[in-house]
Amino acid sequence: MILPDVQATKSEVAINLSRVGVTNVKKLVKVARPDKRPIILISTFNMYVDLPSERRGANLSRNFEVIDEVLEDMVKSPVYEIEDLCGEVARRLLNRHEYATRSEVHMDSELIVKRKTPQTEMQSQKVVKVFAKAIAERGEAIKVRRVIGSEVIGITACPCAQEIMRVSAENELQNLGVPQEKIDAFLNKIPMATHNQRGRGIVSIETAGEYEVPLNTLINIIEQSMSTMSFELLKRGDEYEVVRNAHANPKFVEDCVRDMARRVVTEFKDLPDDAVVKIKQINEESIHQHNAFAELSTTMGKLRTEIGQ
């Protein structure tokens, strides 16, 4: 018995659809590492194709077939970059959906990284978000653009409130008759109080070729661009160091984005000028109900020109 392909029938409203697919697909992904055990990620996938006006629906079961095939093939030919995994899924989606001209794959995961606390040097686990995306387009050949990115939580300290506290402390010490030389020495040694934020830094890089963008490098760039890192486990000595380090390195939300941009240019010298760089910082304020936000969307070429490298 031949079963009907209802999806291939004509729609009553003949218009093209930009994206049709499946979302929130959970899969176990094994990412290979040279000379190390693979990283195991529990990942969420969203997979789409465009749909021409002459079709009523897309054959969505093909999306599941493709992702399972690619994950199975990874056992034989290990994948080292999650954006390459998304790129292969996007390419096969176009091959499987012969009526589509464009496919899109999103992957979101959580990665555990280990960090040593600043004084006791205890190992502490930290959760960071990692994500990848691929867009495949049909032409004379299938062209694929890949995106790799990460979101990391850290700490920022407000420079504005800190300078207000510094001026106030200087005036109080002057009123107490403390010599200016000692006041200056004290203020240069002890960071003044200010309010803090839990910052979320996000960096993504999009390329059209086989360019390597190591996740660990992205994560380090984000961590180093805030006032200091956050830790899940802190003893008293560690807590002192974290608070002191944050207040010794105060940053606005804008400073974080610019620092991330500078580090991206320094770290990724081999990326082409047409690589797309997106950087975002969201700081959850402690003394306000709102969040502070800054964003940059540019290309590596423009970024190199602005920074002068």
Swiss-Prot record:
The protein's Enzyme Commission number: 3.5.4.39
UniProtKB keywords: Hydrolase, Iron, Metal-binding
Free-text remark on how the cofactor is bound: Binds 1 Fe(2+) ion per subunit.
Annotated positions for site May be catalytically important: 158
GO biological process: tetrahydromethanopterin biosynthetic process
Pathway assignment: Cofactor biosynthesis; 5,6,7,8-tetrahydromethanopterin biosynthesis
Cofactor: Fe(2+)
Gene Ontology MF: a single term: GTP cyclohydrolase IV activity
Family: Belongs to the GTP cyclohydrolase IV family.
NCBIfam families: GTP cyclohydrolase MptA
Function: Converts GTP to 7,8-dihydro-D-neopterin 2',3'-cyclic phosphate, the first intermediate in the biosynthesis of coenzyme methanopterin.
Protein name: GTP cyclohydrolase MptA 2
